[in-house]
Amino acid sequence: ARRNLLAKELNEFLSNITVTSDENVDTDLIGLIKEGENSGVEFKTTMRYDMRENKVNKKLEEVILKTIAAFSNAEGGTLVMGVDDDQNIIGLENDYRTLKNGTKDEFELHLRNLVNNAYGVQFATNSLTVLFPEVEDTEICTVEIKQGLKPLYSEVSDKNGNKSKKFYVRSGNSSQEIDITEVASYVNQRFE
């Protein structure tokens, strides 16, 4: 009887912690979203689903990778997917539908595979925290990116499909390419 009572009290205690924690996360996240984009926060409506074309667009995945690199090359930050530039909560359903099983696990796996292939498994493991909080009863994805220990270069495609390596940093509320003539100076100042 005593064991059951202790178990019941422990479960109630733990469930209260979870509720409080979820409420705090929800409140903090809503505040973050209402503040809008800045040097430490970027919103993306989707990871790969093009809302204008109503289909998968691999260029959007490049933009996600560019944003992750820009945060890493600067002071770190938070990428929020499922929220548009006007702070509207869109959710992840459009992206989920583009994946075989349409789950958040598959979404995270796809995201991590993109990052692994672009920047290496060690970076993806040590520098990213991927979460799927609910805001206004809608699941979104937050990616916390730590300030990087070494520079990240992003492979981007031009209009003709030609790929090249570019260096991006966070500047204000956008990811900016640093001109090739300035990269060495920035890298020397930032990473050494």
Please give the residue ranges for each predicted region.
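Conserved N-terminal catalytic/coupling substructures associated with nucleotide/phosphate chemistry
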Residues: A1-E192
